[in-house]
Amino acid sequence: MENYIEKMQKHIHNGRSEEMENRIERLRKYIDEILLNMKDTQERRCGYIHLYGVSQTCAFIALKRNLDFELATMVGMLHDLHSYKAINTENHAEHGAVLARQILDELSLTTENETDLICSAIRNHSSKATTHSAFDEVLKDADVLQHYLYNPLFPVMEHEKCRLQNLLTEFVLSKYYKYNM
């Protein structure tokens, strides 16, 4: 008879192999190396907060929407890595998708379809006013929610207001949180 932990591991990982179960940690280790090598400590701090904050928020939203939370966790970690690594935000979504593909291929972490899914979400995450695939929307929503939750007293960016209101409504939080418009 299986114990509770074994049952939960099978449930959480949907029967994936041990190697697949460690994909998140393998990617986290790779990203940590990039961030640790950043000379600007303030940018490094922002990188850790934002990338891992979005990653956790992606996992939460994916679980709620019955999407792959493991891939969602990975896309959150990767989505703005190019901006922090290159210290350049120009066309960061497109450059970020290219970097994500290179990293995923180098580490052999994902199938071709999974890599395409992750790269699509990264490529489209700056287009907050446009609706893309359900998985793309997880990243956009997590990005907006992390910006807000970092400090709810900060003004909400104009292009994120509608999406934030929809998220707070989806998670039945709009009556508890006031946000700066």
Give a label for each model feature:
Residues 112-116:
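All-alpha amphipathic helical-bundle segments outside canonical DNA-binding/catalytic cores
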